[in-house]
Amino acid sequence: TGLGSPTYDTFAAGDHDLNFYLWGGMGGAAMAGLGLALAQPKRRVLVITGDGEMLMGLGALATIACEAPKNLAIAVIDNGHYGETGMQRAHTARGVDLAGIAKASGFKSTTTLQSMASLQRWLPTWNKKAGPVFADIKVSAAPAPMRLPLRDGTAIKYRFRTALLGTDAQK
């Protein structure tokens, strides 16, 4: 996950040892997901990030499209605001179309989800599509309760590596 609200939301939905919370790396979640997808081509990789972070790393969409990993999906939780810096309006609230940018970059499958019903229809399908896959998930900017996951980067890294690679990951 990227930083901020997508991390809190992912943790609240259910922590898992294969969740890697990318604290403090604004703009880097999509590229971290690309690296993981290329290194683990038999595993499906889902990056959950926010619109502000995706806007900060737009070049990642072109790089991902050029590499074209079939096992990668990017889900952007888009509230149209920079939630971590005071809720200023983001460019997506001013008409910037992230799914359109992903499509123009060369993503195989792109969508904008405007409702809970459309999200519920998309969720069971994202991992069946050949990637890269991109979804811009429009959500309310209303504050939601925060549940914070572990913030110890070293512990998160080792927990993730062990879940991904097995016990030899600690060596």
Regions found by a protein language model. Give the residues of each.
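General beta-strand structural signal in soluble alpha/beta enzymes
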Residues: 1-3, 21-22, 47, 111-114, ...
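Glycine-rich beta-alpha junction loops
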Residues: 3-7, 79-81, 138-143
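Short acidic loop-to-helix transition motifs that present clustered carboxylates
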Residues: 6, 27-28, 115-119
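Thiamine diphosphate
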Residues: 9-78
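Short active-site-adjacent structural elements
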Residues: 9-10, 84-85, 121-122, 142-147
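Glycine/aspartate-rich loop-and-adjacent alpha/beta segment that forms the canonical ThDP
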Residues: 13-16, 128-171
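Long, charge-dense
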Residues: 77-87
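Conserved thiamine diphosphate
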Residues: 89-124
